[in-house]
Amino acid sequence: MANRLKEKYLKEVVPSLTEKFNYSSVMAVPKVDKIVLNMGVGDAVSNAKNLEKAAEELALISGQKPLITKAKKSIAGFRLREGVAIGAKVTLRGERMYEFLDKLVSVSLPRVRDFHGVPTKSFDGRGNYTLGVKEQLIFPEINFDDVDKTRGLDIVIVTTANTDEESRELLTGLGMPFAK
């Protein structure tokens, strides 16, 4: 069974993007390549339990086991040594990616307090979009009673679009609520 958002992409978004940007081939139409979820846990240096809890929450949100990220360099000011575990990340592709994007757009983002749309300035110039979430409680999988501390996470949506304009049209077509 194909995902609802993937069907919407194939039936509605591809024809509208082809019409707007005059693509010669269906393969030239931009698509979402992958979604990377990253949770930096700065206090993991002093308490390793915080990193375990963050990785557990990231696994619940994404439905996939996260990769523990380690410090590349030692930074004395942060009491950080090279090779110490300081975060967790997950890369979503295929069905899980579409499921997560659908859930993010239709369930999670509307649960944000005082939500007026996601900022339009978060494109990187190459057609990728980065979104910061201040607390993990907006995701329905996270049980409010089990949370010891609110943690934010970064969501990077990598697309095959060449420009920010194409990427924005793609994400708008998929239902991303951009601020007016």
UniProtKB/Swiss-Prot annotation:
Transmembrane segments: none
GO CC aspect terms: ribonucleoprotein complex; ribosome
Entry keywords, A to Z: Ribonucleoprotein, Ribosomal protein, RNA-binding, rRNA-binding, tRNA-binding
Gene Ontology molecular function, alphabetical: rRNA binding; structural constituent of ribosome; tRNA binding
InterPro entries: Ribosomal_uL5 (IPR002132), Ribosomal_uL5_bac-type (IPR020930), Ribosomal_uL5_C (IPR031309), Ribosomal_uL5_CS (IPR020929), Ribosomal_uL5_dom_sf (IPR022803), Ribosomal_uL5_N (IPR031310)
One protein family per Pfam: Ribosomal_L5_C
GO BP annotations, alphabetical order: translation
SUPFAM superfamilies named among the record's database cross-references: RL5-like (SSF55282)
Subunit composition and interactions: Part of the 50S ribosomal subunit; part of the 5S rRNA/L5/L18/L25 subcomplex. Contacts the 5S rRNA and the P site tRNA. Forms a bridge to the 30S subunit in the 70S ribosome.
PANTHER family the UniProt entry points to: 60S RIBOSOMAL PROTEIN L11-RELATED
Summary of the function given for this chain in its UniProt record: This is one of the proteins that bind and probably mediate the attachment of the 5S RNA into the large ribosomal subunit, where it forms part of the central protuberance. In the 70S ribosome it contacts protein S13 of the 30S subunit (bridge B1b), connecting the 2 subunits; this bridge is implicated in subunit movement. Contacts the P site tRNA; the 5S rRNA and some of its associated proteins might help stabilize positioning of ribosome-bound tRNAs.
Family: Belongs to the universal ribosomal protein uL5 family.
Name of the protein in question: Large ribosomal subunit protein uL5
